[in-house]
Amino acid sequence: MPTIQQLIRFERKQIVGTSKSAALESCPQKKGVCTKVYTTTPKKPNSALRKVARVRLTSGFEITAYIPGIGHNLQEHSVVLIRGGRVKDLPGVRYHIIRGALDSTGVKNRLRARSKYGASKPKK
């Protein structure tokens, strides 16, 4: 515990918090180009092949982003839109690719939560 005199000489430093999605630079989304599209395995106790992409953003950052939904058309040099949001069982994956924007197509035959996966309304 500092004395009053010490507080007069050295004022308290504010604790600066770090961003959970630094590469977005306070923007809601960022555009980027896929440099590598691959699958990876989640940490214990889960088991799957999660689809992820390495993306170079327009801001110069190189990030790993998750590709949500069933099936995708992404490959190297695809232009994608990135939003924040981590994947809890994939360490280091702190961003999501927005489906249905730019080169990423929406999920086929998706009936519920369509807006989250860029799926169009089905024909009656």
UniProtKB/Swiss-Prot annotation:
The keyword Iron belongs to this UniProt entry's keyword annotation: no
GO CC terms in record: chloroplast; small ribosomal subunit
PANTHER family named in the record: 30S RIBOSOMAL PROTEIN S12 FAMILY MEMBER
Source organism: Cyanidium caldarium (Red alga)
Subcellular location(s) of the protein: Plastid, Chloroplast
Annotated Pfam families: Ribosom_S12_S23
Family: Belongs to the universal ribosomal protein uS12 family.
Originating gene: rps12
GO biological process, one term: translation
InterPro entries listed in its UniProt record: NA-bd_OB-fold, Ribosomal_uS12, Ribosomal_uS12_bac
The protein's name in its UniProt record: Small ribosomal subunit protein uS12c
General function of this protein: With S4 and S5 plays an important role in translational accuracy. Located at the interface of the 30S and 50S subunits.
Main location: plastid
Classification of source organism: Eukaryota, Rhodophyta, Bangiophyceae, Cyanidiales, Cyanidiaceae
